[in-house]
């Protein structure tokens, strides 16, 4: 013990020197060192029993089924990129996998020298104004309420919340402030900071200049140069219809202020001296003469395009100036196009306006007046009014091209009509054709009204004999269809017959002597309507004497019989089957109800109250 205490320092120095000597020796003799670390599972052979396999098979399996890890082995050390092996697959239990945690030393942002950083105040959290706890609100506070404390805390909270809200959300931006903030940025001028950011120097053009040559002038800055208009029009009160119409119908035009065009060196103005034009390197195009500032300004000064902001809701398909420049003849034709609504009149107008077309002559003789079918039994007798139909009042100013001889309604044989058509169709005007059409419709309507008055007596009831008297109404439809067929027959004869047939004289007699009264009724009406029908169709110069051919009589008679058979409307007697007449005499049981309940109404509470008052 005495020796150890006496030589303690020497023994310690000897051991220290010995260890130091050993370390120096190991460092000098690197080839004699060996790596004694335990092997890590960086490469695992996926084989159940690899010991029993041969060496070749083990080598193949190791090459094909080996999981290579991230451990890199060196001479003196190994490097694992993923860290040390995980102990029980838990990084918390493995040394070296702990994530270091550092304490926060600074609570404020560090500022540079001579600068002050303004820290925005935090928005206060909602808490209980009574006890100050953030876990619940004042309505859930278990402590007794202190009104003074609640009022004070609420006031402090609202003040703090208002300051934070004013700084964050209730800040207004004005155009002047924006201009001051971005006033240092000017279009077309590249600052030194922007050159550093783009990686260009003052002796070279920026890359976007070459791209602008392909895309053109920036549309955003072109919009800035656009001049706004109020859209208000001022009229001086003078009767200048042409100027007013042109000013009202013309769309708004966009004008530009050429003084606001921006200079871009290398794009719309010449490149400064000493700066090369490297458009080939950037795959662009050289400067275009059309993109020069003076050329573009001249184009914008003469540019007149409709603005997208124009709110002209009333648009006309054609300006009124076009109508004023039309000749008078064109205006008359346009009016005729709108007024004409008949196929016959349209065909006549087209023939007169385009060119002269040959019209074949009419067949000899007037249109045949066929005998209508006999009326069924039970038809009431004819009234004297049907024998003398009144003629419609016709104006005298439009001259009629044809003259019709009057017929004698008292005879059974109809007198043939003598038609003198000496007027060409080109001489007829639109007004004359319209007047003739109006006369035809008036005659047809009067004939139908006359037939309806004669067929249905005034005192005939609708019940009982309505079935037997109904066919007389249907006769009017047959007569109207026969007249329409006659009109079609006349038009067909115009285009089909081109030869003049010798004139013959025949008298039209009734084939059935029992229907003399019916002929007396139909002949005056048909003569009137057919006479007007002859006036509607203009024909070339020809003469038609009283007479007709047997062939024409057969054709018209067959047409009328087919029109009668092809009537799609059934007889009115079929509609009355199973229909009981409704007469007011059957409603006697429902009358007198109010008289029976009037006594009950007198005793109602409302009437009793009225009597008391």
UniProtKB/Swiss-Prot annotation:
Ranges in a coiled coil: 431-451
Segments forming CCHC-type zinc fingers: 126-143
Residue ranges, compositional bias (Polar residues): 304-321, 345-358, 404-414, 462-473, 494-519
One of the GO biological process terms: mRNA 3'-end processing
Organism this protein belongs to: Gallus gallus (Chicken)
Biased segments, Low complexity type: 384-394
Keyword hit for Lipid metabolism: no
Name the record gives this protein: Zinc finger CCHC domain-containing protein 8
Alphabetic keyword roster: Coiled coil, Metal-binding, Nucleus, Zinc, Zinc-finger
GO cellular component, one term: catalytic step 2 spliceosome
UniProt subcellular location: Nucleus, Nucleoplasm
PROSITE patterns documented for this protein: ZF_CCHC
Family recorded in the similarity comment: Belongs to the ZCCHC8 family.
Purpose: Scaffolding subunit of the trimeric nuclear exosome targeting (NEXT) complex that is involved in the surveillance and turnover of aberrant transcripts and non-coding RNAs. NEXT functions as an RNA exosome cofactor that directs a subset of non-coding short-lived RNAs for exosomal degradation. May be involved in pre-mRNA splicing. It is required for 3'-end maturation of telomerase RNA component (TERC), TERC 3'-end targeting to the nuclear RNA exosome, and for telomerase function.
GO molecular function terms listed in the Swiss-Prot or TrEMBL record: RNA binding; zinc ion binding
Location of the region described as Disordered in the Swiss-Prot/TrEMBL record: 304-330, 344-417, 448-473, 494-546
Biased composition (Pro residues): 360-383
